[in-house]
UniProtKB/Swiss-Prot annotation:
It comes from the Eukaryota. Contains 6 disulfide bonds. Signal peptide: none annotated. Belongs to the peptidase S1 family. Snake venom subfamily. This is Snake venom serine protease homolog. GO terms for cellular component: extracellular region. Expressed by the venom gland. Its main location: secreted. It is found in: Secreted.
Amino acid sequence: FLVALYTFR
């Protein structure tokens, strides 16, 4: 899920 990676930016 891209949102999960975005939250870890």
